[in-house]
């Protein structure tokens, strides 16, 4: 239904609810520009945190913008409330109970929810995200050829051996914390996270990708991992910054808007 509080003179905001794996109900914000479509669409995947709210973008006046959530986040937490820290290892000892696998399934369902909505006719679709959101955006693009562009900032290395190194910052450090408590489960952790590795999925991505990394990032996308990921993505524009998990910060945000505008035909 429409949300009068967040709607603006140039766009309307809707609250969207849809069903994911295991019948889990999810929430998303959807904004639709005024005027006649079709409109290009941008899906901003959620990072690792409890709240994923509407975020300002100058493209909202010209594109449909979707802000989905995954299970455990605010407004998608009626059944399960995610813990931060803690979500990365919730149920990790068993393939069937590992919550992060369902988080990735939730990401895939966001594309279905977008294409199934009736508020606007859609043109080309881009996915974007930072941290976990960057990894989710890449994962969806690897499985959906109808995505036209991906802008991923410091995508989380979950599933890659780089995520299990000691001495990392959070949130990846949650994995090392877990293995210090349960050292005998290292092989189980490797096995149950392996197919979430962005590098494993990278070769399947057909869309162009704008990838940003920070040379001091040890909590989400370590530099060596990011560089290897860029090599595996068939069409990747890698930008390296002297930052950490924020990547290029405001500077890269401006580049990203210009890049997305070009890929979506917004001029």
Please state what every model-predicted region is.
Residues 23-26, 32-41, 51, 60, ...:
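Proline/glycine-enriched tight loop/beta-turn segments at coil->beta junctions
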Residues 224-267:
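C-terminal catalytic histidine-bearing segment of alpha/beta-hydrolase fold enzymes
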Residues 1-36:
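N-terminal cap/lid segment of alpha/beta-hydrolase-fold proteins
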Residues 86-131:
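Gly/Ser-rich "nucleophile elbow"/oxyanion-hole loop immediately N-terminal to the catalytic nucleophile
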Residues 53, 57-105:
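Cap/lid segment of the alpha/beta-hydrolase catalytic domain
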Residues 215-221, 246-247:
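Acidic catalytic loop of the alpha/beta-hydrolase fold
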Residues 205, 211-213:
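Short beta-strand/loop motif that positions the catalytic acidic residue
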Residues 139-184, 248:
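Hydrolase active-site cap/lid region
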């Amino acid at each position: 239904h429409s949300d009068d509080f967040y709607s603006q003179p140039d766009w309307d905001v809707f609250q969207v609810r849809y069903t994911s794996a295991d019948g889990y109900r999810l929430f998303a914000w959807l904004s639709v520009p005024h005027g006649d479509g079709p409109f290009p669409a941008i899906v901003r995947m959620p990072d690792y945190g409890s709240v994923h709210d509407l975020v300002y973008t100058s493209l909202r006046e010209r594109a449909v913008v979707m802000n989905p959530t995954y299970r455990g986040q605010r407004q998608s937490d009626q059944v399960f409330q995610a813990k931060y820290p803690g979500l990365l290892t919730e149920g990790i000892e068993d393939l069937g109970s590992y919550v992060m696998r369902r988080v990735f399934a939730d990401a895939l369902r966001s594309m279905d929810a977008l294409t199934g909505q009736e508020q606007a006719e859609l043109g080309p679709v881009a996915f974007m995200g930072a941290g976990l959101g960057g990894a989710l955006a890449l994962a969806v693009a690897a499985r959906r050829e109808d995505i036209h562009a991906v802008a991923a900032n410091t995508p989380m290395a979950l599933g890659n051996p780089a995520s299990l190194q000691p001495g990392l910052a959070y949130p990846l450090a949650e994995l090392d914390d877990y293995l210090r408590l349960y050292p005998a489960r290292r092989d189980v952790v490797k096995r149950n996270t392996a197919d979430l590795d962005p590098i494993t999925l990278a070769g399947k991505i057909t869309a162009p990708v704008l990838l940003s990394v920070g040379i001091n990032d040890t909590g989400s996308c370590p530099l060596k991992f990011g560089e290897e990921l860029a090599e595996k993505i068939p069409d990747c524009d890698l930008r390296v910054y002297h930052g950490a998990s924020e990547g290029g910060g405001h500077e890269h945000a401006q580049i990203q808007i210009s890049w997305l505008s070009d890929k979506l035909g917004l001029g």
